[in-house]
Amino acid sequence: MSRVGKKPIAVPSGVDFSVKDNVVTVKGPKGTLTKEFNNNITIKLEDGHITVERPNDEPFMRAIHGTTRALINNMVKGVHEGYRKTLTLVGVGYRAATKGKGLEISLGYSHPVIIDEIPGITFSVEKNTTIHIDGVEKELVGQVAANIRAKRPPEPYKGKGVKYADEHIRRKEGKKS
């Protein structure tokens, strides 16, 4: 039995939740999210709690049950609190600056890396080396952060590159002379 799927989701005050034909819409102070789910899963709002139920115990249904509950929980948390990923630039001459609603990053290439404006994402830069990525959709915030990190991932010898703020880089010893 899915333990994740059985847990009810509390709907905080200030968040509106609606389901129509398995299309879930969540509105909150930070924004609105809409997502369509598998039509075999039943989603109900009762007494300020969202419950997710499945029709049977087939392995596919058990998997979808827990996933659906987790995605709805992420939607509710996103419109209520929002999500933030923080990236740190490590290296001489590595710096970032906001450019309009986008981002311009110098990562040691012959040209600056430009990240265009992404709907639903807000960039902020602190001290030229810390990038904050904010948004209501957890998946989108994480994907944008991963795309920026992929422009220059941290290397294991000096640790130079773009890394998550809470990421620990395993360092290697240089060659012995």
UniProtKB/Swiss-Prot annotation:
Keywords: Ribonucleoprotein, Ribosomal protein, RNA-binding, rRNA-binding. Pfam families: Ribosomal_L6. One of its GO terms (molecular function) is rRNA binding. SUPFAM superfamilies: Ribosomal protein L6. Signal peptide: none annotated. The keyword Acyltransferase does not apply. PANTHER family: 60S/50S RIBOSOMAL PROTEIN L6/L9, LARGE RIBOSOMAL SUBUNIT PROTEIN UL6M. This is Large ribosomal subunit protein uL6. It comes from Fusobacterium nucleatum subsp. nucleatum (strain ATCC 25586 / DSM 15643 / BCRC 10681 / CIP 101130 / JCM 8532 / KCTC 2640 / LMG 13131 / VPI 4355). The gene is rplF.
